[in-house]
């Protein structure tokens, strides 16, 4: 019935996301290497690394409230499958499509609300491409380096952005990169965005909640990190390298489906 359908959609989303994570990882590593030679640090679970998520669970149709987000992470932790892979972190995250108001133009944008920021961090390497720090207050934002250079926006500048029915001013406190947007193009486009035609930015959770009129802790993504780097199933071989990870994903899908069906 309907819940079966829901479950199937979600599983496809998760598996697709795992593949995305793999490709993002490869391109991120190559990209990082060309930018500043910090290639060896990019995956570190340290201040210099970004710690890409190993599994994403996405809510493609709406928003989970704070209570549901926390409950899902709790259920995932409590019912983790018998596996050599150990759960390190489950972090609810919010990501919304929106707008940046630039001069008289409405520029399509994607905004991320990043709270703990342990998994899939914003990357501000010690390199002249980037500067500043992460957003901490609800009126601060880190903008992507391509937004900074393409629209001539710098540290300390105020920008006006929108999401949902909200429209507010934020102060730029950082310029950096994020693994979701290394290839800087709108979703579905094969071509990189021309300067000034696309924006991405990274706010505190409180900042994005305030902008979009959301409740505290609302999320539409769960980023799951396991200890170490698990083996992924590489799409270009017949061998199933990521068997262990596939079992974990199957189990997570069941947990999420069961939890949502019972709420």
Q: What label would you give each PLM region?
A:
Residues 1-263:
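Membrane transport/envelope proteins' first extracytoplasmic loop
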């Amino acid at each position: 019935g309907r819940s079966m359908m829901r479950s199937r959609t979600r599983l496809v989303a998760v598996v697709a996301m795992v593949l995305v994570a793999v490709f993002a990882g490869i391109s991120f590593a190559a990209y990082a290497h060309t930018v500043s030679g910090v290639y060896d640090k990019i995956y570190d679970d340290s201040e210099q690394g970004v710690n890409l998520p190993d599994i994403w669970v996405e809510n493609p149709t709406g928003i989970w409230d704070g209570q549901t987000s926390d409950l899902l992470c709790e259920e995932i932790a409590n019912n983790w499958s018998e596996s050599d892979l150990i759960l390190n972190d489950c972090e609810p995250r919010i990501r919304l499509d929106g707008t940046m108001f630039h001069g008289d133009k409405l520029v399509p944008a994607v905004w991320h609300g990043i709270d703990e920021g342990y998994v899939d961090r914003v990357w501000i390497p010690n390199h002249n491409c980037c500067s500043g720090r992460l957003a901490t207050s609800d009126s601060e934002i880190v903008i992507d380096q391509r937004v900074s250079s393409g629209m001539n926006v710098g540290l300390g500048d105020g920008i006006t952005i929108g999401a949902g029915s909200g429209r507010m001013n934020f102060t730029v406190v950082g310029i950096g990169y994020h693994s979701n947007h290394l290839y800087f193009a709108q979703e579905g486009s094969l071509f990189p965005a021309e300067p000034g035609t696309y924006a991405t930015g990274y706010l505190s959770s409180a900042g994005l909640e305030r902008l979009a009129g959301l409740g505290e802790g609302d999320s539409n993504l769960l980023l799951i990190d396991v200890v170490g780097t698990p083996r992924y199933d590489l799409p270009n071989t017949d061998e199933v390298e990521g068997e262990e990870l596939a079992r974990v994903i199957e189990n997570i899908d069941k947990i999420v489906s069961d939890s949502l069906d019972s709420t």
